[in-house]
A protein has these predicted regions:
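Short, low-complexity N-terminal intrinsically disordered segments enriched in polar/charged residues
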Residues: 3-4, 8-53
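Short beta-strand edge/turn micro-motifs at domain boundaries
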Residues: 11-16, 120-146
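Sec/Tat-exported extracytoplasmic proteins
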Residues: 32, 36-39, 43, 54-55, ...
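Hydrophobic pocket/interface hotspot
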Residues: 35, 46-48, 55, 69, ...
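A mature extracytoplasmic/lumenal domain signature
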Residues: 51, 61-62, 105-108, 140
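Hydrophobic residues on conserved beta-strands that form the core of alpha/beta folds
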Residues: 52, 85-87, 136
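Surface-exposed, charged secondary-structure patches
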Residues: 56, 71-117
Length: 146
C-alpha cells in the first residue's frame, strides 16, 4: 500500500528549483511509485527499466551496481514486497534541474519465510531526468525492528 502525506503534493518540501520543469515532482514521484509497484507485482524487468545503467543500491551494509543488484538482492526484494504488506509515506520530493531526490519512511508487518516481520524503514532515492523520463540513480534503504 502506498500512502502520501499532503506535504508530498504541495508546499516547500518538494519545491522545484531553477531549471526544473513544472510537474516534475509528480513525474519524479510516479517513477518511485512505479518502481515499488514493479517489485510488488514481481516484475523485475519493469523495476530494472526504472534504474539508470549506472545506478547503485545501498542495503544490508553493501553497495551494489545495477547488475549486482539484479543478480543478488532484486529477487529477495521482490519476494519480500509481495509477502509483507507495507505502508510508505513520502516525506520529501525535491528537484533541482535534472536531479531529484525522494525520501520516504515505511512500516512493514507480516510474515516472510515463516518469520514474523515488524519493521520501520527509511528510503532515499536519487533520480536524474533522461530522454526517457526520470530514472533512479541511487537507492539507500535502511530498516530496524519495531
Amino acid at each position: 500500500m502506498f500512502l502520501c502525506t499532503a506535504s508530498c503534493l504541495a508546499g516547500s518540501p518538494h519545491a522545484n528549483r531553477e531549471g526544473a520543469v513544472p510537474g516534475d515532482s509528480t513525474a519524479i514521484l510516479a517513477t518511485v511509485t512505479a518502481f515499488h509497484a514493479a517489485l510488488a507485482a514481481g516484475d523485475s524487468t519493469a523495476a530494472l527499466a526504472l534504474l539508470a545503467p549506472d545506478a547503485v543500491v545501498l542495503e544490508s551494509g553493501e553497495v551494489e551496481t545495477r547488475a549486482e543488484y539484479a543478480a543478488h538482492h532484486l529477487a529477495a526484494d521482490i519476494e519480500f514486497s509481495r509477502a509483507v504488506p507495507s505502508q510508505r509515506v513520502v516525506t520529501l520530493v525535491h528537484s533541482e534541474g535534472a536531479v531529484a531526490w525522494v525520501a520516504a519512511t515505511s512500516t512493514a508487518r507480516g510474515t516472510f519465510r515463516d518469520r514474523a516481520v515488524a519493521s520501520q524503514g527509511a528510503e532515499l532515492m536519487v533520480l536524474s531526468r533522461t530522454d526517457a523520463g526520470w530514472r533512479i540513480r541511487a537507492i539507500h534503504w535502511s530498516s530496524r525492528r519495531l
